């Protein structure tokens, strides 16, 4: 190579390409790979033959002139374009340094042009100088890399297939916000502008999927939906064709784009839900027992409420069996009817208060961040106490701060008047107390039932006492016998007199006590906790101002809906509930730990 004689630039340009039979290296970024391609200063004797400018300087157009750029083609295309007259401004734009920027850099191809180029059939006609410049773009490779210079030949060259196009070959700068050839043809979408994604899936090249088996196709496109047009949406009709040309759908892939219109016609295919996962109550983690498909619930504790129901049903049944018939015929039918009404009110309110959701607050609403394993174990955690300002009902401007606490068991910040029951293992809204006779908490949703049960049980016990005693006394007077003989005749009614006298004081005391609490605007827990402070420091922020307003606000308020809705189907991923059913969870973790800590006998040696 070093012994080769040196030649001038003009001689090398005129003789190098015909002599060599191999293509020259492609130009990169508009800079020629050979220094001999650079034009001389005079611009008359030699010409710059680069991968971008392969025509003589007289036929090149200025970059500043508006119009379609010249096609970057091979020598064959150059021989066809030499007859075009040169521009008057071409001399002013000549320089001894070639253009460093590709002319298509500022005019990337839009997705509409790309779709039109790929779907256009290959034409065999030879382009003439009078044809539009788009015909030259369709029959020549418009990529910088593919425009290598080949040796000139008189044999006709095979026409290249229509180019896929790149972002450097579109003659007009597209609007990236609206210009896109949507596969559905009815809406304009935001184009990503990545033509390289067309080569994403090479496995599907020339595979034609039947339309009825294509799951990704939208077959229910309304034909009457007018397409949204923009000035750049007519680029595919530059040749004057009003009807769309047939497209070859082989190896086509839909461009990635995001919908810019809220009225998109694309269907959202939701993933099919899993099989029947059960109801919400099956995934509840509290110490609550459910039955009746989640309609009824009770604390998972000693069922003392069964004994309470027996204490109500058994004496009432004895009264209906022995005293009610005699009183119906000898005194008045109103006596047993009124007793039946009181029994119905008492027993129904007992059932409601015992099996109704008292107002359980959902869990895991405010989970704390987990501690870092590498953190300091002695580091103080986040605070679990706070204060909430409550506007007083007795004043338009006054307010009072009430304490709230974070429940580490339920992972929630409790609202005011909410407490955690250690028996039910639940945070209950406006918790009054846990009633062992109901085996359930008494909260906001069942407090009215509890109050009705206590009051009706008091009236029922007093009515049982009076009706049974009237039965014995009226019989003694009508028959003219002694009191002992009347008792000996009606032993069961006399036993109901004793039972009523023993049973009435307890519900009567509860009734009076809760009338006192309701009148003060406090719950049982609030009243007991207030005694920890001096009388001057005791406050009642939830009172309505007087006794009657407090009674109305508690006894006449509507019952709020349940928060957890235990009867509804369980949805996977509900953070309020557990991810595993109760029956699938280990029943006793401590028992399992004891089993692990048991003594394991040594394995006997073999052989």
Swiss-Prot record:
Its main location: endoplasmic reticulum. InterPro entries: Palmitoyltrfase_DHHC, PFA4/ZDH16/20/ERF2-like. Residues 1-305, 352-449, 519-607 are cytoplasmic. GO terms for cellular component: endoplasmic reticulum; endoplasmic reticulum membrane; Golgi apparatus. It catalyses: L-cysteinyl-[protein] + hexadecanoyl-CoA = S-hexadecanoyl-L-cysteinyl-[protein] + CoA. Residues 53-66 have a biased composition (Low complexity). It is found in: Endoplasmic reticulum membrane. Keywords: Acyltransferase, Endoplasmic reticulum, Lipoprotein, Membrane, Palmitate, Transferase, Transmembrane, Transmembrane helix. The active site is at residue 435. Residues 245-256 have a biased composition (Basic and acidic residues). One of its GO terms (molecular function) is protein-cysteine S-palmitoyltransferase activity. GO terms for biological process: protein targeting to membrane. Residues 327-330, 471-497 are lumenal. It holds the Pfam family DHHC. Its EC number is 2.3.1.225. Autopalmitoylated. The chain crosses the membrane at residues 306-326, 331-351, 450-470, 498-518. It is a multi-pass membrane protein. Residues 73-102, 125-156, 176-192, 227-242, 257-272 have a biased composition (Polar residues). Residues 1-198, 217-272, 570-607 are annotated as: Disordered. It comes from the Eukaryota. Residues 405-455 form the DHHC domain. Belongs to the DHHC palmitoyltransferase family. ERF2/ZDHHC9 subfamily. Palmitoyltransferase specific for Ras proteins. The DHHC domain is required for palmitoyltransferase activity. This is Palmitoyltransferase erf2.
